[in-house]
């Protein structure tokens, strides 16, 4: 535990803004991860902590670790942004707390999204699939292909028989595996601003993007 305290101090000194904790068998017994979290809170109070047994309590330490790290990376910013939005809308008279669509096509309360930020990864294209299914139902179509093109990726989804297929092994468009329920999408790094680059003798496209200033909303 003394070594852990030293490591936490070093991370804070290096500018760490969030912690991700993933121990091998934590999905079966969370005691050690919870102890690590307690020590982190003692040494560095106020820094957000993502624990793998809370984020993705499944076998497969690599996928669980990646999922936890992604949550720790995007969690604080997501919580701040959605929290500001929720409070701003409430101040303008919105009676109910907002809900945010998730990668399963469902919705989560804004208050919970910051703790499980990874659950909204790829939720934009999934939201398009949900909307397409609704529209298809109104028009009498149950076989639909959707396409969602952004600045960094091109996402394709399929609706067959009015159902959304669950992805048994979801990956982000950067090739990172996540171990959470998600609607199946096929993603390629060919967005509107994707940059082609070489790494030795290999050609890559994205995920770097040239961006847009002003954005498409101003066109």
Spell out what each predicted region is:
Residues 1-219:
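N-terminally biased helix-coil "hinge/interface" segments that flank
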């Amino acid at each position: 535990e003394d070594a852990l305290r030293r490591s936490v101090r070093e991370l804070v000194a290096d500018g760490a803004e969030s912690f991700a904790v993933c121990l091998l068998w934590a999905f079966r017994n969370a005691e050690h991860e919870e102890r690590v979290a307690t020590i982190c809170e003692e040494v560095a109070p106020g820094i957000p902590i993502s624990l793998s047994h809370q984020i993705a309590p499944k076998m497969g330490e690599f996928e669980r670790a990646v999922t936890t790290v992604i949550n720790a990376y995007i969690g604080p910013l997501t919580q701040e942004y959605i929290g500001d939005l929720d409070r701003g809308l409430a101040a303008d008279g919105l009676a109910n707390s907002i809900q945010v669509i998730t990668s399963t096509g469902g919705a989560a309360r804004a208050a919970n999204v910051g703790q499980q930020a990874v659950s909204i990864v790829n939720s934009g294209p999934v939201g398009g699939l949900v909307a397409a299914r609704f529209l298809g139902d109104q028009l009498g179509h149950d076989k639909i292909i959707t396409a969602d093109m952004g600045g960094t990726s091109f996402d394709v989804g399929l609706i067959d028989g009015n159902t959304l297929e669950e992805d048994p092994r979801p990956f982000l468009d950067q090739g990172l595996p996540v171990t959470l329920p998600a609607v199946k999408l096929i993603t390629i790094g060919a967005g509107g601003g994707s940059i082609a680059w070489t790494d030795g003798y290999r050609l890559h496209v994205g995920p770097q993007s040239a961006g847009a200033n002003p954005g498409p909303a101003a066109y």
